[in-house]
Regions:
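Acidic/histidine-rich, surface-exposed loop or edge segments in extracytoplasmic proteins
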Residues: 4, 10-23, 353-367, 425, ...
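Alpha-helix initiation and N-capping motif
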Residues: 32, 73, 99, 312, ...
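Acidic, metal/ion-coordinating pockets
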Residues: 1-293, 375-382, 397-399, 433, ...
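Charged/polar, solvent-exposed surface patches and flexible loops
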Residues: 37, 41-44, 104, 190, ...
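Short, solvent-exposed loop/turn motifs
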Residues: 158, 364-365, 491-493
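Surface-exposed intrinsically disordered loops and tails
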Residues: 24-28, 127-142, 238-252, 296-336, ...
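A short C-terminal boundary segment appended to hydrolase-like catalytic domains
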Residues: 272-409, 510-512, 540-563
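Feature captures C-terminal
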Residues: 6, 12, 112, 121-122, ...
Length: 563
């Protein structure tokens, strides 16, 4: 689940609990060649023991790296086909840029795409990216696939598998306007009744709702044997010896329902051997999540320096003895597919040095005791820069913190790092006029969403705009002391009655995650004509050296929270 186009290995920071003390390292892990190798071994074992094997993907294959930015899902389809996926549920990032990329993906895959609570019946008959009539689209009332589930067999026992997607998809992604997402609980109950009426007791839910919601759903809805889920990047199992968060035990049971999640970014994979019990129940006989690496995987210090040979031998011996680590040779067929069809086309990004950093730039979503993001305000500045370079007279910019994904280390930074890791989402940029009072309310809504409603990615980082936030003030009056920087570089008082031309991501412009006041636009949003990573690369290249922003653009005051 949540592989996010991480087809190549990742340098993962670990803190190993060695006998002589903790050891901080970076280990190259994961990637689809290792994933393919693990799956091939699991299939061979299943065949030898005469057991079926179901390979399920819990969504969010899209976005995350240059592989998606450049190939728009084509590489995802080819690599998932190569793995031999049995079914995949639709994740929210599959719909970040509308239905079209997923519709094209659907035409290339050889496995069913599950989304039982996605109603596509309003699609026009002549819509070029219509999915409603596709036989692999297992959605709500699709005439090409009348039942909203698929059936697999364990010997002579049928097992039904259906998928559920986030019912608030319109709020956190950008599906087409003809898409409707039905309530999760009611849909689940309806489908389970239908499955039982068809004489099937054992039911697997392939979910992209997130771990807390999966656990809640298991307690609210009877009849689900097993949930395989994604969305929250939850890693079940005890990975404490590797310094990874020990979040939840593997295969927790809620109301007779087992719940399985397997991390993120193709770093891990879960394998569970499950017995079918009477009355639709299942029991895990053995299994768990494992971190994928190799005997010869690159080992470095946290600073990226080589480790002495004796220390490397000690660490590799330690890793071999960890039951949650799989040491695998990458699969040669998957490696060839990547190398010959996709990796070579991305090579120029890695060799294109865009900018240099005298010091690292830290990124956090919500400001903490060390301050806020040093990256996100620069992205906001980049949108202003790019618009003004193109002759668009914008006044202020806002960038939501969740759009940036990593901190930047000191030294030279490549286009691959910026477009593939820092700003991996192919977000377009919009500009439009909005009344000052609505802009102030949008800032407040985004901050409330970040601080009180769990949506940390919405926190607003501005450019040429500054504000203070007072948590103890009544709703609607929390954002104060706003100023706007004019073209001479002087700060001017913010005017609530004036129209300002705002530039932001198209995602934010749609009023997502607390920014709903931006929907009260005074002019139609216009696209700038390029994506956020391109704007940032152009901005960074023009500066040559990036340093943290000098202006204090926001102040947070927490006397007490008032809801």
């Amino acid at each position: 689940n949540d592989t996010h186009s991480h087809f190549d290995e990742t340098a993962l920071p670990l803190r190993l609990a060695l006998l002589d003390g903790a050891c901080d390292i970076r280990l190259h892990c994961g990637g689809f060649p290792r994933l393919a190798s693990f799956i091939k071994q699991a299939r061979q074992r299943a065949i030898s023991e005469q057991m079926p094997l179901f390979l399920l993907d819990a969504g969010d294959s899209f976005q995350g790296t240059l592989y998606f930015s450049c190939f728009k899902g084509q590489a995802n389809a080819a690599l998932l086909n190569q793995l031999g996926i049995d079914a995949m549920v639709v994740g929210n990032h599959e719909l970040d840029t509308g239905n079209a990329p997923l519709a094209n993906f659907l035409r290339q895959i050889r496995f069913p795409l599950l989304a039982a609570n996605w109603d596509l019946s309003a699609e026009a008959e002549d819509k070029p990216t219509r999915m409603q009539d596709h036989p692999l689209m297992v959605s709500w009332q699709n005439p090409a696939h009348p039942k909203p589930y698929i059936v697999k067999w364990v010997d002579d026992v049928p097992v039904a598998i259906f998928g559920l997607v986030l019912e608030n998809m319109q709020d956190i992604a950008a599906p087409d306007g003809d898409s409707q997402f039905l309530p999760v609980v009611e849909t689940a109950k309806t489908i389970i009744e239908q499955i039982h009426a068809d004489g099937i007791e054992h039911i697997i839910l392939l979910s992209h709702l997130g771990f807390p919601r999966d656990c809640q759903l298991a307690q609210e809805v009877d009849g689900i044997s097993l949930i395989v889920g994604g969305h929250t990047h939850t890693l079940q199992g005890d990975f404490g010896a590797l310094g990874l968060a020990d979040e939840h035990p593997y295969g927790e049971r809620f109301n007779r329902t087992l719940v399985l999640h397997a991390g993120y970014n193709s770093l891990m994979v879960g394998l569970a051997e499950v017995s079918l019990l009477p009355e639709g129940q299942m029991r895990i006989e053995q299994g768990g999540n494992v971190l994928l690496t190799s005997e010869t995987a690159l080992l470095q210090s946290q600073q990226g320096e080589p480790l002495p040979a004796p220390q490397q031998r000690t660490i590799r011996r330690f890793l071999r003895n960890q039951r949650h680590v799989a040491m695998l040779q990458p699969d040669s067929a998957m490696e060839r597919l990547l190398a010959n069809n996709y990796r070579a086309k991305l090579r120029h990004y890695a060799s294109d040095q865009v900018v240099s950093l005298p010091r690292g730039l830290r990124h956090v979503r919500i400001p903490d005791e060390r301050g806020g993001s040093q990256v996100a305000p620069l992205v906001a500045e980049a949108m202003l820069f790019q618009a003004r370079e193109m002759g668009v007279p914008v006044d202020v910019a806002i960038f939501n913190a969740g759009g940036a994904r990593i901190s930047l280390p000191p030294g030279p930074v490549s286009a691959a790092e910026l477009a593939g890791r820092l700003l991996p989402f192919a977000s377009t940029i919009s500009h439009f006029e909005v009344r000052g009072g609505q802009l102030r309310l949008a800032l407040e809504g985004a901050i409330v969403n970040a601080l009180e409603l769990g949506g940390s990615g919405s926190f607003p980082y501005p450019a040429d705009l500054r504000y203070s936030y007072h948590a103890s003030a009544p709703r609607g009056q929390r954002v104060r002391q706003l100023h706007v920087k004019d073209r001479t570089g002087r700060w001017q008082l913010f005017d609530e009655q004036r129209d300002y031309r705002l530039i932001t991501t198209s995602y934010t412009a749609m009023g997502k995650e607390g920014y709903h006041a931006l929907l009260n636009q005074r002019s139609e949003p216009e696209l700038l004509g390029l994506i956020i990573s391109d704007a940032f690369i152009n901005y960074a290249r023009s500066r040559g050296i990036l340093t943290p922003p000098q202006d204090a653009l926001y102040q947070l005051n927490f006397d007490q929270l008032v809801s």
